[in-house]
């Protein structure tokens, strides 16, 4: 195999691999079952606790909305909105830097950060629901 052909194949392989790091932006939305309803204040507390656990910084708290941001390794920045009610919440992309956002696609690490945050919020809500069920008076 000629060295020119080999170099071309290696370049194509590297470009293909580099293109795989960009994925569609992950926006999550969850409706809680009727048995798991919480107060808006409790929903906000669970969301803020999950943000703190994952080292996101809360920028602004307002009724039914939390704005947060994260900077990783002093370079990679992402900002999100979390809208919530007593029975639902949604995490949506707001802004980013150095994560290659373009045409609704972004570096896969952003999606990983949002996915882990989402998992922690759900876990916090589950824990709260279990604790509430255990402390409710039995008939």
Q: Where would I find each of the regions flagged by the language model?
A:
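Hydrophobic alpha-helical targeting segments used for export or membrane insertion
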Residues: 9-14
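Ser/Thr-rich, low-complexity intrinsically disordered terminal regions
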Residues: 21-139
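Bacterial N-terminal signal peptides that target proteins for export
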Residues: 1-8
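C-terminal motif of bacterial Sec signal peptides marking the signal peptidase cleavage site
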Residues: 16-19
